[in-house]
């Protein structure tokens, strides 16, 4: 095609006797075609390649500019990005905390205030400001649904309930959630989302936007499913063959709740939802999850055709209420519904874990399923006084779960002040980022966190077994944490805070072990630079190296990087 167009261009120059009108029309055709090609190109204007999710040795990682990338992230409070002026002082503060990626919402209500009229001011300014502050962005599309309801839809969608119907509860009361099976709802959302992607292509010439989140914590609150006549009619029809085929082809990979519902009901190849999965609230949620997944997959597929960015959905996770859907948004991509979402939304790259759980590690582990990489875009419930756990959870996620990214919610809240421990923790994680991503693929890393049942009491790296310990005199607010990376047969990088690590040989032929050396330092341009040699009273795998009295808050951010060498005999 390009050769053909080049010949046309040459022909135009040679045939100067062609009628002027015809010449202008050809030139216009060439210009339009070039514009179309560039809008869908991987050339971002600076020869940068698009971010991708790449699988290596069975592990999926985010690649940015052809290099593995860790999202050392932070999400804004919901309303902050609604105003350019409000964000002016926030950008620099976020950067000062050593964040590399901001999770930033764009509201459909503001983006398309009147049908067919789009306001690009917010997305334009946010991309520009992020780039100027050397930050990457993950754009959160608050479209049809946010936290199980539809408060971010434009007024013209909310008002016209005939055109954009709501879901109904079992008692036939009208919900605040627009339908996930209505084509008008989907088409309107789809049109706006595509417009957003088209705009990002036009203005993001530096690869600032890394990923797209479609909707936010979808599902129906207050009911197991939509009981509208339209939804009930669909519920009484046969389960789509596409879903049954996926389930039967992946039986050994399914979560227990899906496996049991399908197999214990006879592994049917056709039938209604209740015939195939049995009559239960869980079946209602399977039905809802399928419809949400199909709806959102259409947005993902259309968006990628415009600008092929990695795309994910996030989950308000299933917990409480004796596991009855509707206590959490029924049908969302929670850990019980991961299989249904993977079947119904193949164009979604990640099913992400919004993790405010008191059993943090268990919730995270539930999402490491069938090659779904762990991404935690929201964590640390500041409304429940969880104000200091971001550092420990970040280390734990990257080390133990080989996460793609971690982000506390509400980074612009005053609790994340300039001396918050996340600042030093993120500085250290950024310093170790190349080692972490390499070790994740090679399975030469592990992480740990005090007080979490999913945290390993011991683990093996190479020929050595490590045992984290937390029995230090310290402020009760400080929870110990860390990660260990194997960099050679007998050398390891250890980093974290408020803990110590025991070690022993895992080699039965050489059952004894000894710590030969400990250095404190950091990496500069990929090379280890020693700050000091640790010995005497400070000798050992101690974080920090001199924990005489860490009752003071000053030690909240006393995060060291140690290089240790072990010997077995």
Describe each model-derived feature in a short phrase:
Residues 392-509, 520-526:
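Aromatic- and carboxylate-lined catalytic core of secreted/periplasmic carbohydrate-active enzymes
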Residues 86-161, 292-306:
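Aromatic-lined substrate-binding rim segments of carbohydrate-active enzymes
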Residues 164-338:
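Polysaccharide-binding and catalytic clefts of secreted carbohydrate-active enzymes
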Residues 471-472, 492-569:
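C-terminal beta-sandwich/jelly-roll accessory domains of carbohydrate-active enzymes
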Residues 73-82, 105-121, 170-191, 276-293, ...:
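The substrate-binding groove and active-site-proximal loops of carbohydrate-active enzymes
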Residues 38-100:
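N-terminal carbohydrate-binding accessory modules
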Residues 296-309, 335-438:
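Catalytic-core region of carbohydrate-active enzymes that cleave or remodel glycosidic bonds
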Residues 30-31:
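C-terminal motif of bacterial Sec signal peptides marking the signal peptidase cleavage site
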């Amino acid at each position: 095609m390009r050769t053909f167009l080049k010949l046309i261009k040459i022909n135009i120059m040679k045939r100067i006797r062609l009628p002027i009108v015809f010449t202008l029309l050809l030139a216009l055709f060439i210009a339009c075609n070039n514009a179309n090609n560039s809008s869908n190109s991987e050339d971002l204007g600076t020869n940068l390649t698009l971010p991708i999710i790449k699988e290596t040795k069975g592990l999926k990682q985010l690649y940015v500019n052809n290099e593995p990338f860790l999202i050392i992230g932070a999400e804004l409070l919901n309303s902050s990005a609604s105003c350019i002026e409000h964000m002016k002082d926030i950008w620099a503060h976020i950067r000062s905390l050593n964040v590399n990626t901001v999770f930033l919402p764009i509201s459909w209500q503001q983006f398309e205030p009147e049908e067919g009229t789009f306001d690009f001011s917010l997305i334009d300014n946010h991309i520009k400001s992020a780039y100027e502050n050397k930050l990457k962005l993950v754009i959160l599309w608050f479209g049809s649904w946010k936290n199980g309801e539809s408060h971010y839809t434009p007024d013209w969608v909310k008002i016209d309930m005939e055109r954009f119907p709501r879901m109904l509860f079992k008692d036939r009361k009208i919900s605040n959630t627009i339908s996930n099976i209505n084509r008008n709802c989907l088409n309107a959302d789809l049109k706006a989302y595509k417009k957003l992607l088209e705009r990002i292509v036009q203005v993001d010439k530096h690869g600032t936007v890394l990923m797209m989140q479609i909707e936010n914590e979808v599902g129906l609150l207050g009911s197991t499913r939509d009981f509208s006549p339209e939804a009930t009619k669909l519920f009484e029809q046969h389960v789509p063959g596409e879903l049954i085929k996926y389930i039967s082809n992946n039986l050994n990979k399914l979560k227990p709740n899906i496996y049991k519902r399908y197999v214990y009901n006879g592994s049917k190849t056709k039938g209604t939802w209740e015939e195939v999965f049995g009559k239960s609230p869980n079946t209602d949620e399977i039905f809802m999850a399928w419809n949400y997944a199909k709806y959102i997959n259409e947005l993902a597929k259309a968006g990628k055709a415009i600008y092929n960015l990695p795309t994910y959905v996030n989950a308000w996770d299933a917990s409480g209420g004796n596991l009855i859907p509707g206590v959490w948004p029924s049908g969302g991509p929670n850990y019980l519904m991961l299989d249904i979402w993977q079947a119904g939304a193949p164009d979604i790259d990640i099913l992400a874990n919004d993790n405010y759980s008191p059993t943090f590690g268990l919730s995270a582990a539930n999402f490491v399923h069938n090659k779904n990489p762990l991404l935690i875009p929201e964590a640390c419930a500041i409304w429940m006084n969880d104000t200091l756990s971001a550092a420990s959870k970040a280390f734990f996620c990257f080390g133990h779960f080989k996460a793609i990214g971690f982000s506390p919610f509400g980074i612009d809240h005053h609790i994340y002040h300039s001396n918050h421990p996340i600042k030093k923790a993120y500085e250290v994680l950024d310093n170790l980022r190349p080692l972490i991503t390499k070790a994740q693929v090679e399975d030469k890393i592990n992480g740990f966190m005090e007080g979490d049942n999913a945290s390993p009491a011991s683990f093996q790296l190479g020929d050595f077994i490590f045992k984290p310990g937390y029995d230090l005199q310290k402020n009760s607010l400080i929870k110990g944490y860390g990660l260990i990376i194997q960099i050679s047969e007998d050398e390891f990088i250890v980093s974290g805070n408020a803990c110590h690590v025991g070690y022993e040989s895992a080699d039965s032929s050489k059952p004894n072990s000894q710590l030969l050396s400990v250095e404190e330092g950091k990496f500069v341009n990929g090379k280890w630079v020693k700050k000091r040699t640790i010995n005497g009273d400070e000798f050992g795998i101690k974080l920090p190296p001199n924990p005489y009295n860490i009752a003071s808050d000053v030690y909240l951010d006393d995060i060291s990087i140690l290089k240790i060498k072990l010997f077995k005999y």
